[in-house]
């Protein structure tokens, strides 16, 4: 999915490389399919925390073992880094600091922001989402994620994607 950041126009879209490839699920549209976002929502967690005055890029967070009623997030490499700045936690996609930041901010605030950004499955699941949403414990579509990042590129100003109608488009294909 390719979006013009200034206009929010969708200028390129390939849902799958080969629609007729049954063996590799060619008929699944990767742009519209609901998938785990993994760590792709972490920038929004930190952006909201900064907006709410809960953190700055230099704020120190402890990256140490933690347990939230049985939910014990770990980093990808299963190592902990002690004290880290928010900017380092984001740059290295550290899981524990992201979960701690989300816990401090509150899941409802984060879920509300995701809904404002047009995350449809998040809206449907809003009552059952918890801290694991920081690590991909939710369902999103690529088009929603892409528009979230487009919103970052526009200084936080959200607009819905503009789907071009090829029959009305004067742009070359």
Label for each model-derived stretch:
Residues 1-23, 113-117:
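A short, well-structured edge-of-sheet supersecondary motif
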Residues 55-110, 158, 169-173:
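Conserved catalytic neighborhood of penicillin-recognizing serine enzymes
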Residues 5, 9, 40-41, 56, ...:
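Extracytoplasmic
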Residues 5, 20-21, 50-59, 120-123, ...:
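Secondary-structure transition/capping motifs at alpha-helix termini
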Residues 119-173:
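Active-site-proximal helix/loop microenvironment
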